[in-house]
Amino acid sequence: SEQTGAHAIFMKGHNHTDKIADAEAELEVARAIADNGINVTLTPEGDKYTMYATNVKINKDGSKKYKFAEGLMATYTYEQKTPTEINSSAESSVRLAINHANDKHAQIALIYDKHSLFHTKDIENGMKLYQSRHKAWKTKGVKAVVVISSKKILYEHHFDE
């Protein structure tokens, strides 16, 4: 980033989604994180890159299924969601983003609010909703929710004890 000196690295082997809009959102978020002074690395995914896997499931037949987070933010893994609309409620959308990040054993649930759908209260209430439905939330991987606004401003939210 010319603004902060932080960098966004795109490692060879990083699989962008088949949806062009989602791939563009991943790149926009990586640049926005760097513009906010945090180094970010989009890590590779797939069978050749299992060392970057954040979760491994062993199937009944002994085969392994690897899951990969989006990348590293500083030294934390994150998984990104870019909602284009709110289906049931903003709070539920936040809870689902946290579940998605936990499924991949990421430490940060990152929400790219490209379409200005969320307010601070939505994020806080979504985190509380997640905590109320998952009693063992402290032992899960996600430690924070980071929101990148449509203006590329980074907001960090932590769980209440």
Q: Can you describe what each PLM-predicted range is?
A:
Residues 1-52, 57-62, 83-161:
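Metal-dependent nuclease catalytic core centered on acidic motifs
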Residues 65-66:
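Terminal amphipathic helices with adjacent charged low-complexity linkers/tails
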Residues 71-84:
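Conserved catalytic cores of phosphodiester-cleaving nucleases, focusing on short active-site segments
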